[in-house]
Amino acid sequence: MFKNIIIVVAVTLCALFTNEHVVYSANLEHGEQIFSANCAACHAGGNNVIMPEKTLKAEALEANNIKNISAIANQVKNGKNAMPSFSRLSDSDIEDVANYVLSKADKGW
């Protein structure tokens, strides 16, 4: 019994401290469609035509403390600075586009 507890704790700690982003069971293809229709005008290829230093590339997301699905979804839903709110999108659409963005950032766009 003690051995099982140790294994569970070890696996949990590994999962907590890994640097890999977890892309949840989102529909990345749907996220790409939402991105193309709503985000690509300013963020084509992970860039930013309004504020060039605030791209969707992994390094920029990390530097701006936007390093997980929740943070990206919050930015999409509420907007910030020059980025408008996309709260008209459904929560499912926002989650899919956030997963798509993080997936692309992890792959270098």
From Swiss-Prot:
SUPFAM superfamilies: Cytochrome c. Residues 1-25 form the signal peptide. Binds 1 heme c group covalently per subunit. GO terms for biological process: photosynthesis. GO terms for molecular function: electron transfer activity; heme binding; iron ion binding. InterPro entries: Cyt_c-like_dom (IPR009056), Cyt_c-like_dom_sf (IPR036909), Cyt_C6 (IPR023655), Cyt_C_IC (IPR008168). It is found in: Plastid, Chloroplast thylakoid lumen. One of its GO terms (cellular component) is chloroplast thylakoid lumen. Heme c binds at C39, C42, H43, M83. Keywords: Chloroplast, Electron transport, Heme, Iron, Metal-binding, Photosynthesis, Plastid, Signal, Thylakoid, Transport. Functions as an electron carrier between membrane-bound cytochrome b6-f and photosystem I in oxygenic photosynthesis. Belongs to the cytochrome c family. PetJ subfamily. Monomer. This is Cytochrome c6. The lineage of its organism: Eukaryota, Rhodophyta, Bangiophyceae, Cyanidiales, Cyanidiaceae.
